[in-house]
């Protein structure tokens, strides 16, 4: 089973200011809305009203079968896994937390 870092999501208080900051550094904004923005370089900005996820890091996986395998392994180990969710960008993911409480997302392109 292989994983690839997909993105890191951070919370911001002022979306416009944060987007302008990253764009001034040469980051390429792929998606921008009032509650979250995403840059090609793998930075996701979560606005104050975004409540789908906490700050997290996301691992890109191959497909639904791999997602089911990971979810089963985690639940067998006693970890809670959210139900898979289809995002507006077409990806499907689920969230879980590591033993230290850090949120982790696993996602694939549907």
Language-model features and meaning:
Residues 2, 9-44:
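Core segments of cupin and vicinal oxygen chelate
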Residues 5-13, 32, 49-110:
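Vicinal oxygen chelate
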Residues 21-28, 45-47, 61-64, 75-79, ...:
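Generic alpha-helical propensity signal that fires on short helical segments
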Residues 6, 25, 33-35, 55, ...:
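Residue-level marker for the onset of beta-strands and adjacent loop->beta junctions
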Residues 28-55, 61, 103-108:
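Conserved short beta-strand elements that form part of the metal-binding/catalytic scaffold
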